[in-house]
């Protein structure tokens, strides 16, 4: 996970349920990974493992700690992102139940601090302003409010470009 709900709440004050915030954070993580074509993998933390249920077994010392985000690749059944919930010297466990499989590649995913802060800003904007998208202005009596326009070149991925600019250094070329 790009950021825990508790970490997000330390940056932004909101009364939304933890489940809602967790789902939105997971969606933003996938959106950013697709947009940048960047997996944010730390290849120094990589091992081959066998999967049984939700437990990964490595032949050597495994490099993951509780709370780490991992990416499973070279897998026919379980490719994806998971969070480590328990770890020993040669095994680690994730919350999801997976299909049994041998010889998958597991790599730690590490997001830079500026990406985490950008995600916090994007989610804060989403919570506070998403409902106002499409409304250009409103007037009540002598009070008038004009909102940010989200058409044309002002928006990227459904967010104002000013909120997505932090991703530019992380975009990888795709051919």
Give the label of every model feature segment.
Residues 123:
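Short Cys/His-centered divalent metal-binding micro-motifs
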Residues 142-144:
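Glycine- and small hydrophobic-enriched segments that form the cores of compact globular domains
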Residues 136-140:
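Short acidic-hydrophobic surface loop/beta-edge motif
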Residues 127-134:
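Short helix-capping/linker segments at secondary-structure and domain boundaries
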Residues 1-117, 130, 153-175:
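Conserved short "hinge" loops at termini or chain/domain junctions
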Residues 147-149:
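Short capping micro-motif at the N-terminus of alpha-helices
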């Amino acid at each position: 996970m790009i950021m825990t709900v508790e970490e997000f709440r330390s940056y932004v004050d909101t009364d939304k349920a933890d489940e809602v915030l967790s789902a939105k954070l997971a969606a933003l993580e996938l959106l950013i990974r697709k947009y940048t074509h960047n997996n944010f993998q730390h290849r120094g933390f990589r091992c081959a493992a066998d999967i049984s249920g939700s437990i990964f077994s490595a032949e050597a010392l495994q490099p993951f700690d509780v709370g780490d985000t991992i990416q499973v690749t070279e897998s026919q059944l379980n490719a994806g992102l998971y969070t480590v919930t328990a770890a020993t010297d040669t095994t680690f466990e994730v919350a999801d139940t997976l299909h049994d499989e041998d010889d998958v590649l597991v790599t730690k995913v590490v997001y830079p601090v500026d990406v985490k802060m950008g995600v916090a800003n994007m989610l804060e904007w989403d919570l506070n302003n998403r409902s106002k998208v499409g409304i250009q202005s409103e007037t009540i009596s002598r009070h008038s409010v004009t909102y940010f326009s989200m058409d044309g070149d002002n928006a990227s991925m459904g967010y104002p470009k000013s909120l997505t600019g932090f991703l530019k250094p992380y975009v990888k070329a795709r051919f």
